[in-house]
Amino acid sequence: MSSFLRGGHLLSGVESLTPTTHRDTITAPIVESLATPLRRSLERYPWSIPKEFHSFLHTCGVDISGFGHAAHPHPVHKTIETHLLLDVWPNYARGPSDVMFIKPEKFAKLQSRQPNFAHLINYRLVPKDTTRYPSTSTNLPDCETVFMHDALMYYTPGQIADLFFLCPQLQKIYASVVVPAESSFTHLSLHPELYRFRFQGSDLVYEPEGNPAANYTQPRSALDWLQTTGFTVGHEFFSVTLLDSFGPVHSLLIQRGRPPVFQAEDIASFRVPDAVALPAPASLHQDLRHRLVPRKVYDALFNYVRAVRTLRVTDPAGFVRTQVGKPEYSWVTSSAWDNLQHFALQTAAVRPNTSHPLFQSPFARLSHWLRTHTWALWCLASPSASVSAWATASALGRLLPLHTDRLRLFGFDIIGRRFWPRLPFHGPEPRFLWETHPACRPPVLFADSAFECQILAGLANRCSPSPFWSRLFPTASPPSWVAYSALALAAVPLAALALRWFYGPDSPQALHDQYHATFHPDPWTLDLPRRLRRFERESFMRTGSAPLPLSLPPPEGSLLPVEPPLAPSDPEPALEPSPPAASVPAPAPAPASEPPPSPESVAPPVAVVAPAVQPARAPSPSPALLGAELRFGDLPPVSAWDSDPEISKLGESTQGTVFAVTPGPRAPEPDTARLDADPSASGPVMEFRELQKGAYIEPTGAFLTRARNSVSSSIPYPTRAACLLVAVSQATGLPTRTLWAALCANLPDSVLDDGSLATLGLTTDHFAVLARIFSLRCRFVSEHGDVELGLHDATSRFTIRHTPGHFELVADNFSLPALVGASSVPGADLAEACKRFVAPDRTVLPFRDVHIHRTDVRRAKNLISNMKNGFDGVMAQANPLDPKSARERFLMLDSCLDIAAPRRVRLIHIAGFAGCGKSWPISHLLRTPAFRVFKLAVPTTELRDEWKALMDPRDQDKWRFGTWESSLLKTARVLVIDEVYKMPRGYLDLAIHADAAIQFVILLGDPIQGEYHSTHPSSSNARLSPEHRYLRPYVDFYCFWSRRIPQNVARVLDVPTTSTEMGFARYSQQFPFFGKILISARDSAKSLADCGYHAVTIASSQGSTIAGPAYVHLDNHSRRLSHQHSLVAITRSKSGIVFTGDKAAADGTSSANLLFSAVLLDRRLSVRSLFSALLPCCPFVTEPPTSRAVLLRGAGYGVARPLRARDAPPLGPDYVGDVILDSSAPILGDGSANAPQVSTHFLPETRRPLHFDIPSARHQVADHPLAPDHSACAIEPVYPGESFESLASLFLPPTDAESKETYFRGEMSNQFPHLDKPFELGAQTSSLLAPLHNSKHDPTLLPASIGKRLRFRHSEAPYVIAPRDEILGSLLYAAACRAYHRSPRDVEPFDPDLYAECINLNEFAQLSSKTQATIMANANRSDPDWRWSAVRIFAKTQHKVNEGSLFGSWKACQTLALMHDAVVLLLGPVKKYQRFFDQRDRPSTLYVHAGHTPFEMADWCRAHLTPAVKLANDYTAFDQSQHGEAVVFERYKMNRLSIPAELVDLHVYLKTNVSTQFGPLTCMRLTGEPGTYDDNTDYNIAVLHLEYAVGSTPLMVSGDDSLLDSEPPVRDQWSAIAPMLALTFKKERGRYATFCGYYVGFTGAVRSPPALFAKLMIAVDDGSISDKLIAYLTEFTVGHSSGDAFWTILPVEAVPYQSACFDFFCRRAPAQAKVMLRLGEAPESLLSLAFEGLKWASHSVYALMNSSHRRQLLHSSRRPRSLPEDPEVSQLQGELLHQFQSLHLPLRGGHMPNPLAALFRLLQQSSSLGPTYAVAPIARAPQVLPPSMADNATQVGPVPPRDDRVDRQPPLPDPPRVLETAPSHFLDLPFQWKVTDFTGYAAYHGTDDLSASAVLTTLCAPYRHAELLYVEISVAPCPPSFSKPIMFTVVWTPATLSPADGKETDYYGGRQITVGGPVMLSSTTAVPADLARMNPFIKSSVSYNDTPRWTMSVPAVTGGDTKIPLATAFVRGIVRVSAPSGAATPSA
């Protein structure tokens, strides 16, 4: 314990204690110390704070508990405010202090915390302060210290200085200010989850925690407080100190006077995300906010683009794509992500220009230094050279004026001689001598005179040679050019230095520093410089006379400057009038923690007209003024409220549809304001279709504009955004410039270019103008639907396709591919009618799309089961007249749902707030002819009665209105469900299945109102997902307004309303006698109803409207009433609400009802915040939409052309056109010696970051060739005679295939297909021997197998590792250590080099196991949005042929798990790393089959097995039986090898959180997870060593299969351990045991003869024997190569099958394959023949070659291989080998003894084997899976009592037709002729083939081709038919059919029509021909006999007259003619 007493070790000491009494005793003080802070935190911070903000608040010093429960619109801001008020400020208040701008209740809490808070001072500055402060203070602060709460941002330093001047005793102000520090450079928040803000002019709009209802506005200049160290006003100095920052909330201290130590300038730093700033682009300015990126992502991407071998253009974007969705990076802008990937892409090839040589001498080091520092040498040498050049030139210049007297060189006098002879005593003369004297120049006597120029100059020239006479003249000076030359020479080095600096290159050190500054910047910090400022004094109070301090008496006159009032106040008649208001009032202080009221409640500024100011001085305020409160006038009416800025006035969606709403009396819209201010426009603002009249197609021209002035616009032609003009020009031939000129001449500039023309392009609004000018009509085809715009009478028609951002001209018959299955859903006519419907008030229905709803049978089954059992609904109410029949109907419906398939219907959902008017437009829609066949379902009878009153139906139609139970028994085409969220869960699906006639469903409801709750405790309906979540995909818009609720309720709920009622909310102590009482509990409502009151429950009143006041009774149940039902209660009445009962239930306390309290106490709250979890994520509309406008926009591809064209073919794996950097070339050599590596250039962008893609560091091992493993001398086996065909004919007994199948949900499985299957060996197909698993042909395979193969968790909560799992896992680990002779306490150090090789091996396996095209097609497996714990389950396709499955029945399939690529790539190396150590430590007596061939297994058996009785074992549901103990066991294994903790935690997380498409799975083994085979094998080994004392007993293990050579003794502990395991053993004891499908024994291994015999039979019958013969022969040779001894390990019953297999191979195998049956080695001649074309070989084969073949192999070119060359790596590749043993695939080879195996692997690739070994591709049908089977996964059982099933026959092929090509030129000709007039006098029957019609024959005579586009028969009544209706039976058929008289309705499409009478007199009936069923070509190069034929029968009418026609029939249509024949047409 001494080590635990040192600091820092206490925590580890406590954690090391086991859960014993010692630990409990030691940790007792911890619990005691936590109790009080936890309780205090819960009391002080009770709000529910999201977990992502916990760490932020902890860093701010806020001690939150994390267990908060109370809801708050912005809890983090509230917590910071509370911390500042209750934890920080009380410590600053060391004396009496005043507090400003805080609510009285908060001040009371603050005062109770710190008594020094003496006074509260509040000023009402704006109207909303009336709700905050009950009164306005009339005095100024009177204490030395003042605390100003969240108001400093509204005051300037000059105003604060004025407060100090007004209060002389005031010394310091503690103030809190809410302002984002990043607003200094951006308008985008760095903490968007915490707050957002935006700029509006000089103001900043602050929005806390994503709650737009709580935003408020403050001046942007508030940021100056964070940038000020102090300020001076006049001669007074004030210091500003930043005490602390809590995110956007800052605490400041403002003091009077200069402190002794004061810094005028400093820097303030603020907390920001961990980010770096990207360098700005060259020569461009880019906002810093869009260059901030996360530092971790930047570092990872930097390394990624330099580590990948081949970098493609899309790789950085793919890497960034994996990070964009992470919530911690929500602060990063999309532009920053774009800049990051672009920066990484552009700079990927940049590397640091540094070197690290190893110097071998100082000279090398010096020379390298000189080469590196050339710039420094330049800088040092240039000044020296410049000085030297100047000195040299100057010296030479001084020599020029000297006169040379004597010059002697080499002893000879060159100039001058000695004047006296050389005497003997003279010394020798020097060999070099230069004697000079200064030259002279003429004196200056007379400037420029002839005397001076001629005489004196000549005299001086003559005297210069004489040293004596030259002294008489002045000394000559050097010429001036000498000085200039010296300066020029001195400037040369400096100029060279300047050029070197300008042209570069820079010094290596500078380049190095620039590289690191660019690519490795320092972390970005937000620093604001602070400095001293100077301000002018401003008035603190702008309300006329300033309040006075409490301690000062009111003076006689105010000497303070008078400022204009800040806000209007009530005038006092006793005072002088105040000066008029000169400015708009500044915003009032708004605390960050208190949400300001919604914008609707803010009144606009009211102009106050004040009388003229009197010159006299204003008198002193009277005592009445000091005691009065400043008040404001009444609030404006609700109609003047502003709308919520977050609620769009146009409900625009991403689908291209815009709902336009009728403008109300609101402020001008921005577009209107822009139009009004546009100088190029004139006239009023109106829609274009009103301005320019025309026959417009709705909704063409529905945009606002004004008339243009006479001058055309000067906006230039949008060259890069004119794709719409190009498309119109191509269609019409008009030049694009002409089209643009037309737009410029007709549209104002603000409409022509709204600011986005250059980037987003033209819109369909511009096309409307072109259509009006040039008479155009166009069909726009987009992925969201087709829309036709233009004029009805247009002269030009064409079609334009719109893709996002682009228009292009297409053919008129162009159409996008329809959604799969959408065209088969009926009700398309209803959908179109619903879209075209316009209500009487000119509004349209608020929905965007008609959705296709696919029913969920499980939900319907759940509800009908609960109804059947009496848990939900009242069956007696369904049909009160016959309750028994209703119950029978429900029971029948319950039975039908057991086998029902999902249905698809069309559906719209109108969702909106209570009273928004959802029912009223639907009631008018149901009156239209298309929707008259409807039925309405409502939750209550009250709502049913209201619907009847609304629609006033006829008596025969009242049945259409009913409750939800009775509606199930009715039938109609249209189903309307009102208050759908009040219905039971699953009602929508049940109602659709109950009525097969339903084609269209209309849902009405409000998701935030009450939902259905079953009253029976046994009901399972609540287990279904709620309706608001189930129906959310169908909510297109939410109608956020109300026509019902009064204004007071709307104000409280923050909801717009159109009601003019002011409303009221009051309390009454008595019940009303006539009003409706709403009660929470059903029992209370029943009691009041029994007493005669009209009382209903709140839940049952949902959907109802109360004209008078609603009486809400309060009781104890009201406190527990949900918010949804509380909202129902307060939104029923149109006039007001009266509360009765217990008033304490609405007193506003925490235990009271929140909504009732808010209404009664008039407290405002936000519905959008309160119900944010229930409201749909869709656009909100605040007014009824009035039209369906379509706005398409396109700019062409000039702005941003995509990398690939839209119609370009998909990229292939060999595409490298986007590779910009290729570093895959080897550094040294040609790469032939490197480890095999696959290029990753083809991988999806989101998968490449998961690959390290690094070359292997494994050195080349110089292995010696292995010695040849020659086989022993074996005796040739002798086989008893057995005919394969004879045995096969009797092998399969007579079998009823259907008796082996099973039924799942009424559908029979298909594991034994036998129909149309070929067979030749027996009486039936051999496929009946064993079940065939193929989900493509058996849709029940996977659903029926789920119950056996998968185990589900009860909820989405993770699986919890239980104590039992920990114990059992540790026991398994200890047993596994015993098996490998390890100590459980040993820990292997982590080897990073080996792990890197495992990563390479895993990546190589993943890249080579599938084709590159397959990997590219599976790009979604690396989708970052795919949760790693989400797994897709699918069935494994295989033919289960082994001894256990032969002659068996239905068998569950094996399930495979498809996991995210990241899981496989991260955890795969872990398993390979473990496998390396397992192979190293595995004892010789333990055999694991992975990585071994059957021949190696046979060798091991011969070496270790004995003739003893063996114990073989298998398990039932082995994967499903491994629970939490397996996870603990695997965790122990990874910890033993020191695997990084992150990988261990990831493995545990995935195992405990896995979920599938069928539901969440419990902890179990999944086939497909990394290391499935290894973990199964280890688990099996551990279990066997737990049960037995294995010791040295030989043990063979492979997955769940195992074999012991003999049964060891059982361990004593097994009896206690066995009950803890969930395993089911299948042990077999005997001398003949099988392992992995082989009989094994002391003589080797033999493939199980019955199983091999069955495989041969199946292959012969299905014709695939040619593909599988070599594989089966290889399996056979495993035992055959052992010689005659293998018979000792085969049971006697297997002998015939072994002989039959030998007989088959001898008679059917080709000669070259029979070589495999020979024992011993192959002859050398055969090897020579095989090695001729050999390019590579294994070591064993290489050892068998002769010298010539070895040289040939060594010098041959190496081909790429698909497997590693190292045998150890190949061995590590053998994962999941056991599963592959049973996988039946087309095989081409097998295993055989080494070296024969290698030899015949080469032979199989030889062309000498012939074409019989070619493998034909297998065509696979698409897989069909049910949607979800988790709940009914066990419905697999015996055959049902009834043998009814559906035999789905294939459809008949279409009849052959002559292919008609589309003509390039054609004419569409309309035609019409009258059939006859019908008088009714006699019956009529007529028919006609249109191809032989005289009218059409004449019309089509000049043409060779004629095609009917449309044809119909139209019947029109005549006036006499009013009293004599006449009936027609009409049908269209192919010409080959001729219906008899009156039999027209016996044919499909036949119709019976009645015309005339009082109803049908004014209608014309048309019967169109369905040309899809008939041949429309009535004339072609060949004749057809299936052209359209019409047949009509008309019975006689009583009283018919031959002269009085009753009706007339016409045939009319359109025929397309083409290919003129050229024949002459006779003239008329």
Swiss-Prot record:
Keyword entries, A-Z: ATP-binding, Capsid protein, Host-virus interaction, Hydrolase, Methyltransferase, Modulation of host ubiquitin pathway by viral deubiquitinase, Modulation of host ubiquitin pathway by virus, Multifunctional enzyme, Nucleotide-binding, Nucleotidyltransferase, Protease, RNA-directed RNA polymerase, Thiol protease, Transferase, Viral RNA replication, Virion
All copies of domain (+)RNA virus helicase C-terminal, residue ranges: 1040-1172
Enzyme Commission numbers on file: 2.1.1.-, 3.4.19.12, 3.4.22.-, 3.6.4.-
GO biological process: DNA-templated transcription; methylation; mRNA modification; proteolysis; RNA processing; symbiont-mediated perturbation of host ubiquitin-like protein modification; viral RNA genome replication
Molecular function via GO: ATP binding; cysteine-type endopeptidase activity; mRNA methyltransferase activity; RNA binding; RNA helicase activity; RNA-directed RNA polymerase activity; structural molecule activity
Residue ranges, compositional bias (Basic and acidic residues): 668-677
Catalytic residues, chain numbering: 723 (for protease activity), 806 (for protease activity)
Transmembrane segments: none
Disordered: region residues: 544-603, 661-682, 1828-1854
(+)RNA virus helicase ATP-binding domain location: 882-1039
Domain RdRp catalytic: residue ranges: 1508-1614
Post-translational modifications: Specific enzymatic cleavages by the host yield mature proteins.
Boundaries of every Alphavirus-like MT domain copy: 65-226
Pfam families xrefs: Peptidase_C21, RdRP_2, Salyut, Tymo_coat, Viral_helicase1, Vmethyltransf
SUPFAM superfamilies given in the database record: DNA/RNA polymerases, Positive stranded ssRNA viruses
Pro residues bias locations: 550-599
GO cellular-component term (any): viral capsid
Superkingdom in the source lineage: Viruses
Ranges where the Peptidase C21 domain occurs: 669-824
Similarity remark: Belongs to the Tymoviridae non-structural replication polyprotein family.
Name of protein: Genome polyprotein
Origin species: Maize rayado fino virus (isolate Costa Rica/Guapiles)
